[in-house]
Amino acid sequence: SSDVCSSDLVKVVCNELKQKGNELVIDAVITVDGSRIKSRENLSLTPVLESASQKEGLPSILLNGRISQKVYDREIALNNLQDEPRFLVVQAGKSENVINYKTVIPFEPWMKDARFVLIPNMCGCGKEEQGALLVMADKVLTRPDKRYEVQPTLAYISPEAETVKHRAEVGTAYLDFQVGKYAILPDFRNNVVELAKIDNTVSTVVNDKNITLEGIILKGFASPEGSYKSNTVLAGNRVKALAEYIRKKHDFKPELFTLDNGSEDWEGLKAKVEADRSVPSREAVLAIINSNDEPDKKDARLAALDGGAPYRYVLKNIYPSLRRSDYRVAYQVRFFTVEEGREIIKTRPQQLSLSEMFAVANSYEIGSKEYNEVFEIAVRMYSDDPVANLNAANIALSKNDLDAARTYLAKAGNSPEAIHARGVLNLLDGNLDEAGKLLEQAKAAGVKEAAANLDELRKKEADNQLFDSFE
């Protein structure tokens, strides 16, 4: 009768149907009411994985009635039976038969869209009857194709405004003088080039309508050969002559200038000898320079060293570069509107304060090319400023450039926002425990963006757990 394969004959529960690495793990429990299988009948149960495009039958279960089992055993003994692959062949018990169907098969890509069904077949008295198909599982649990990608939220800091924007242009002029003289001869040797350097610097500042000149600081140095006293007088007179030259050329007031006499430049000599491996008897030369002798005694000892070879070398190769004037043109820059700042940043970024740059950045869309560029310029101009470094780190994090972010964060200080950015760095880098600690710390310190990143952290942890469960 047709009720033999009704669902109360066979009940199924699927515990697991899941991809693990390259395998498919199957774990189902099939329960059969044995009282419904007559002595001369048998019930075959075939598990099948089926997708729209493909199906694969798995080894089946055969439950025999009492006489059917004897027939089966005899056929096997006589080697007459070419049976299909069986998971289990057993004589059906009179009551409930519980079969734990556990197996592992190679996982194939088509299986990720498959369902798992059981097809019952009742056989006996020369007729066969297929029962209603039973669905054991709607789908195979498979590893997702894509990992969860963290979408960070970043916390930028607006910098403190500068009250006065002090800036300076600095340089060094190597002027040639006639021996023992201090008059400036513009056409003498290379002086035309050296004076042009100073003139250009001063003119650039004077002609810029955004700038107020604050002062010019000049410091003159002499090389150490000869008497310290006369060299000091000479260095002083030469720097005065340079100040007078600039003053006349640009029609400045004398009080604009601050003059400093560096006298004999032993510090400069030491640095240059340390940097030049070709100096004869270099260690001995350095020992004299570093000694506590009076300058004139050092000079005499250098001249006498090793028959004068080291002295001749430094006179020719090092001393000319010690005779110089360092100059610093100090000025003050006015404040700019955002519109002006957008233009100035392209040509003279050093005239903008950090807070002006921040205002310029925020006039663009967050994350736009222009927005990012401003923060990158800011950190170039203010390379040691913690705020500039923090904001540049955020830009790097938004582009997933973790190495750059790490470099900037090393100089970003320990503000709550910097701690927050380090949390985001660890989150993007997969160090979730460390990220959690830092983000919680930032949240406690009042960084409101931390909450969104802690949500991302939880999503990433869940994704990791899910992925690991398929390994």
Task: Put a short name on every predicted segment.
Residues 1-471:
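N-terminal targeting segments with Sec-dependent signals, encompassing both cleavable signal peptides
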